Amino acid sequence: FAGQAIWDDKKMCLPFGGYWHMLHYRTDLFEAEGLEAPKTFDDVLAAAKLFKDNPKYPELEGGYAMNMARGSAAGQQFYEWIYSAGGKPWESNYPGSPDAYADQRGLYNSAESVAFIEWMQEMINYMPPGVEQYAWDERAKAFTQGKVAMINNWSVRTPLFNDPEISKVKGKFGVALFPHAAGAESVPPVGGWIACVNKHTKNKEAAWDYLKWFASPEIHREW
């Protein structure tokens, strides 16, 4: 993650807010059904089928929620999942490797990509109505309100699921490693933010002072 702020061996930006992607699942529901945390795509699909339209859980609108809105929301899902599907989006290796982005010929028609898209198409049947409009906020909101049994989400959202003022699932969920396809390994996405000072700004020192303050341990922990 920190390496993304370096160009030509020079640190160009200030990394902050490193996050990772995890499976969030309702431990109370899984325990009631005698299930363990899903590990594979097949596990996620089977659990989603079980919880969708299950009369024992009328509050659930779906077994799983995913970003499905057109554009960057659905697009990010592909990039988040394709490595754990045993594939990759382009010829170059994983971001952070020496040849990352060197060859961006798309691999969207690869066997792994096609299998993942077909899995997504099957999963839609077990998601809430209107999931085609879901992006990051809608996905998290569905889980926070207890409307789905599972989501994959960035760790920055996890504390909100335990906030009693907004969450109906406080103390009722767990996290697990990013699911993977059969025969593949889990490759959890890691992300975050980088902050820079534009060289054309009129207030470079003030901007730098702000970044140092914002990235300080006490402020960043609160943020």
Language-model features: where?
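A local structural motif
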Residues: 10, 33-37, 121-135, 147, ...
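C-terminal lobe and pocket-closing loops
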Residues: 156-170, 181-223
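Paired acidic/hydrophobic, glycine-rich loop segments that form the ligand-binding mouth/hinge
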Residues: 149-154
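Glycine-centered hinge/linker elements that transmit conformational signals in sensory
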Residues: 48-50, 92-133, 178
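Short glycine- and hydrophobic/aromatic-rich loop-to-beta-strand nucleating segment
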Residues: 21-25, 82, 195-197
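Short helix-loop capping/hinge motifs at secondary-structure junctions, enriched
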Residues: 28-38, 88-90, 125-126, 200-207
